[in-house]
Structures are given as C-alpha cells and as structure tokens.
C-alpha cells in the first residue's frame, strides 16, 4: 500500500445523502471535513492575520501558484524556508497549479502540448508554464497539497474541443507526477475536467484514478454554468472518485453550492467570494446577504447577524461598519471579511453536525428558507 503524505479518514456517512464526515491528515496538522478553505492568493488572506484565521477555525488555507511565481518568486520563498515560514502559517496549505489563472487570460494565451504561453499580467512580458514548471514552483513553495497542471475549458465549449482538452490534461497530469520532487511530504491531486459531458468526465476520472493520486479535484465548475448544471455534473462525477481519498470542488463558495456539494460527497471547497464581497460591504448572514453600506443601516446599532458569535458581530454594529466602509477605512474591510469567513467556516461546522445527526436534508431546507434562496429553484 502506498504511503501518502495526505490521507483521508472517513468517520461517518450520512444516511440519506452522499455526504461524508471525515478528516484529512497533512504534514501540518489535521482538519475536519467537509471544510471551506479561505483563499490567500498572494500568501495572505486579504486583511486577515494568521491568528484571526485560526480563531475562525481555518485548518487549511489556499495560495496561488501563478501569482506567487510572478511575485515575489517561488525560489525566493524556498530560500525563506517555504511558504509556511514565509507567511507564518503553521497549519495546512493548498496551492493551485496556475491552470485557472491561465484560463482567465483567454485573450492572451496559447495552449500547446508542451504547455501554455501567455502574457504576464503585471508587465506584459511573455511567460511559459508547463506541467513540469507548475510542479517545480509548488515544490519550491512547499505546500501540503498541490494541484496538477490542467486546462480548464469553458463549460459550453464544443464536445470535440473538451475531449482533446481532457486528454491533454491527463497527459499533463502524468508528466507532473514524474516531475514531482517531494512526494514524501507534498500530496499531489489530479484534477477531473470534462465540462458538462458525462462521458468525458468519466474518461478524465478513469485516467486520473489509474495514476493513483493521493486526492482528486473536480475542476471546470463555477465558471458560468447554472446551479442545476453544477449539481448534475457532481451527481455523475463524485461517484467516480475513490472513497478513501479526499474530493475537492474547486472555486465554489456560495452557501447553497457548498451544502449541495457536500450532499454529493465533496470534502473540500475554496473561493475568493467571501472576502471579495466583504470588501465592498456585502455580508453573509443567517437571513441572507446584507449590504451594510446601504443608507438604511446608518443608524442601525444592532450586530450584522444576531445569530453569529464572531468577533465582528459580538463587538460592532451595522452603523459603525457602514461608517468605516463609507470612509474607506481598512478596519471595516477587516471586520466584514472576518465575519464572512467565519460564516462559511461555521456553516461547514453546522453541516458536519447535520451529517452526524443524519438530518442534512432538513438542515439544507431550513438554511435555504432562512437565507432567502427560493427552494424550488434550488432542487437537488
């Protein structure tokens, strides 16, 4: 049996759904699953300190290979002792491969079998990223969980294009495995692609499972498809992945999508959504989204969320938060970001309890009604 640096321990399956309660053991600690992972693109979760993230209960955070490669450089981070020491974070770190950022640069990239040529968004210079280079960067960063280099095709791309794309992604995954210098202390995940095509998702999953990665990611979702389309892809994709390994749905952070992903057997999620919207004054609460910058909150001396135990809600009012954000004070962004991250990490804590109690579907229904989602449009 292979000894992986990343292992998944199943604790309990929910009786009525595909949801599973577990934990993932990494070289930098163990975290419970299902788990939402805050995103620290530039080796920092915007406006939050490592101590605050630990208070929130984030046992793992995500950093971005593409951005750290460009600035300050992966070799500099390696000389600093790796990403954990560089950013003073002693818990788990996951790095993406740079594939999604390259996907985002659709107008300035060229994909070949060797890799991707694209323009550096900082200075316009020509850059080249290959499967081997993506692995080398992540080896230098020293993350606990790494991603294979993949192409993320648009969800509505033609079948023939997506077929060629997933076959190339499988070849890239194999090249990445061979290039991986630190398999003893960094777990490399394969990324299943295939847009909305069931047979292509099946082919992609079969290719990657045969390579025996320590864990698997589901990519190519949350890129413009509907909620129902995402759920349909998860319905036929998640069962293709090994039960004894972690399953990670990339780039998903809306509360309803988190719950519906868990129902389909997903263990890990990440998204910039909670911090990005927080900086503009949009806050997630138990009764739906609240835009605290709105004028109606100017003299509202109540907490953001009456049912929230986070530091922000225990100590500050909507009126004060509105004032800070209207005055462009960084402290306001810190407080709203803290709250939104706490909200999603705590939501996953509640989901884990619902799995333990075998009442996840009831929890889902109650949450959607309170949050303001139209349940009929959120069928699963």
UniProtKB/Swiss-Prot annotation:
GO biological process, alphabetically ordered: queuosine biosynthetic process; tRNA wobble guanine modification; tRNA-guanine transglycosylation
GO cellular component: a single term: cytosol
Superkingdom field: Bacteria
Pathway assigned in UniProt: tRNA modification; tRNA-queuosine biosynthesis
List of residues binding Zn(2+): 308, 310, 313, 339
Alphabetized UniProt keyword annotations: Glycosyltransferase, Metal-binding, Queuosine biosynthesis, Transferase, tRNA processing, Zinc
Chain sites annotated for binding substrate: 96-100, 150, 193, 220
SUPFAM superfamilies registered for this protein in UniProt: tRNA-guanine transglycosylase
EC number: 2.4.2.29
Cofactor(s) needed: Zn(2+)
Disulphide bonds in the chain: none
Manner of cofactor binding, per the entry note: Binds 1 zinc ion per subunit.
Catalytic activity: 7-aminomethyl-7-carbaguanine + guanosine(34) in tRNA = 7-aminomethyl-7-carbaguanosine(34) in tRNA + guanine
Molecular function terms, GO-annotated: metal ion binding; tRNA-guanosine(34) queuine transglycosylase activity
Region (RNA binding), start-end ranges: 251-257, 275-279
Active-site annotation: 96 (proton acceptor), 270 (nucleophile)
Family: Belongs to the queuine tRNA-ribosyltransferase family.
Cross-referenced PANTHER family: QUEUINE TRNA-RIBOSYLTRANSFERASE (PTHR46499:SF1)
Task of the protein: Catalyzes the base-exchange of a guanine (G) residue with the queuine precursor 7-aminomethyl-7-deazaguanine (PreQ1) at position 34 (anticodon wobble position) in tRNAs with GU(N) anticodons (tRNA-Asp, -Asn, -His and -Tyr). Catalysis occurs through a double-displacement mechanism. The nucleophile active site attacks the C1' of nucleotide 34 to detach the guanine base from the RNA, forming a covalent enzyme-RNA intermediate. The proton acceptor active site deprotonates the incoming PreQ1, allowing a nucleophilic attack on the C1' of the ribose to form the product.
The protein's assembly and partners: Homodimer. Within each dimer, one monomer is responsible for RNA recognition and catalysis, while the other monomer binds to the replacement base PreQ1.
Protein name: Queuine tRNA-ribosyltransferase
Organism from which the protein derives: Streptococcus equi subsp. equi (strain 4047)
Gene: tgt
